[in-house]
UniProtKB/Swiss-Prot annotation:
The lineage of its organism: Bacteria, Pseudomonadati, Pseudomonadota, Gammaproteobacteria, Pseudomonadales. It comes from Pseudomonas syringae pv. syringae (strain B728a). This is Sulfur carrier protein TusA. HAMAP family: Thiourid_synth_A. The gene is tusA. Belongs to the sulfur carrier protein TusA family. Gene3D superfamilies: TusA-like domain (3.30.110.40). Its main location: cytoplasm.
Length: 84
């Protein structure tokens, strides 16, 4: 990543706090679909399985996982939608 997380400008945010698999990834799929190409999405989740599922989602669909961070049971992800 070329710049610090706090300097990233997000285009949308997905709050998946309190949701469990498969809901966070299902919501992520819809939210990414609504983003413009190259848009940056911040995801906030509490389900530990997102640590596995979200990186795989990005690889499988060609999106960039710009950054991820874990803070006291909360998992944060910054995802850049692939260019069309």
């Amino acid at each position: 990543m070329s710049e610090p997380i706090e300097n990233l400008t997000v285009d949308a945010e997905l709050d998946a706090v309190g949701l469990f698999c498969p809901e966070p990834v299902m919501m992520l799929h819809q939210k990414v679909r609504d983003l413009p190409a190259g848009g940056l999405l911040k995801v906030i989740a509490t389900d530990p399985s997102t640590r596995r599922d979200i990186p795989k989602f990005c690889v499988f669909l060609g999106h960039e996982l710009v950054a991820e961070q874990a803070e006291e049971g909360t998992f944060l992800y910054w995802i850049r939608k692939k260019s069309d």
